[in-house]
Amino acid sequence: MMTNAYLLKRGRQGLDPVDVHGTLEYPGTVATDSGAYQILEYGQVGVTPEEIVGYQEKINTDIGVILDVPTGFRSDPSRARWTVDETVRRADRALEVMTRNDILWMGPVQGGVHLKEVERSAREMAKRDFAIYALGSPTELMETQRYDVLVDMIVAAKKVLPRGKPFHLFGAGHPVLFPFLVAMGCDLFDSAAYALYARAGRYLTSEGTQLLGDMVEFVCPCPACVGTSPEEVMRSQDKTGGTRLAQHNLWVCFSELRRVREAIRKGRLWELLELRSNAHPALKECFNRISQYAEILERSTPAVKPHGIFYLGSSSDNRPEKVRFVSKLPGSVEERRKLVLVLPGRWRRPFHEDPRYESVAKAFDDHPKVSICFYSLAWGPVPIELDETFPIAQTESSDAGDPVLIGERAKKVSEFLQRLHPKSVVLVSDGDYGRAVTKELSKTFAKRILTIFNGERLNPDAIVKSVERKLIRNA
């Protein structure tokens, strides 16, 4: 639970500080903000950085925040630079007067939409030993649905902050954003959006926001929604309806957090991002911006996961596992072999166990002069050496052909084979994808090098015998 230490102090002027857990009647972890939001709203507050630190220590907060100066959304570069410098100065003042090591102190990063200032702020805060680091000023970005800019801000801060410390995002309260924020490395959030939205009759879901007046019935199974209707909640809005709606909004926030954690456990967070990205154009922009940082995400993605992955089309091409595979592909095959046998990578995983081509792959798997490579719609060129590795053999994908995607994959296959400098290439063409690969390889390799077999017409034994004859001629 999070509350505002500045408002508590102002509301109890002249009274001795009391334990915040007792004030809230809540025995769990309590975090207290320092009044920075009030600075953003009103320009100043009547408290010093030293005073608010001392007050938070006296009320026994569990997580405390120094009194920073938010940059906001509309600050120009000069103002942004000043807020960063002033926040650093206030951090130093706060650190000098802290006496309790049992409180987790939070160091805010400022800079707003000015990414160089965000990075500079994060670098300065990283020099100071805070238990938690946080990014400020995102609220207006979220209200205007500039989620792509928020992603840039998070990356600018995260790349210079200590990796072993939690990262908090102030004001992130809409469940639709949780999967995206977690994917970018946010560990903690706080927001009063669940209550503020409820006052305005706004109903939160994991796919967006709805107005009660536009709804006929609730599809949510939470206790606040079962047994009532949007019309009934609207009629009682001044009495209990606002509370009921706030309860639903809070419930859906916790539900989405549980869904995100479960997706992480199963190694399916990227699939959740793909699903959520189709709920709104702004979320699609957010997803596309995250995809641009795929190489950064790859560094912290486990090499092996408890479950396989889903390939859902071109939106899956920037998932961290795919980026890792592409980066390691060039060094996966020896160039010394004279003949490359290119087989279809169809529905069966691993590809060499495909009933139609299993005997062909088996016949040449250990041949000293043959390299086997599969062409997969999800992965492009897949050397047999990687056929049983994660996540190639654990990928579920649809082979329904997108002509653009098929063409792009065929080019990747051709580019990979070029790097092997083979004396001969034998392609077994199968389906639309096989025909696209045929077209690309025909552009790349001379007729004396390239041999093409129709896998849909020839039986496996005929293919094996033809390849053997090709090897004899090359000897």
Regions found by a protein language model. Give the residues of each.
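Short, solvent-exposed loop/turn segments at secondary-structure junctions
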Residues: 7-9, 36-37, 70-72, 112-114, ...
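Non-catalytic terminal extensions that flank enzyme cores
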Residues: 286-289, 297-300, 462-464, 473-474
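Catalytic cores of glycan-processing enzymes that make or break glycosidic bonds
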Residues: 1-46, 96, 110, 117-121, ...
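Flexible, glycine-rich loop/tail regions that form catalytic "lids" or insertion modules at the edges
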Residues: 289-322
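Non-catalytic, usually N-terminal nucleic-acid engagement modules in DNA/RNA processing proteins
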Residues: 1-100, 309-336, 343-420, 428-475
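Gly/Ser/Thr/Ala-enriched C-terminal appendages of enzymes
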Residues: 192-285, 409
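Glycine-rich phosphate/ribose-binding loops and adjacent secondary-structure elements
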Residues: 88, 97-226
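Long, low-complexity, charge-dense
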Residues: 61-66, 88-92, 103, 263-290, ...
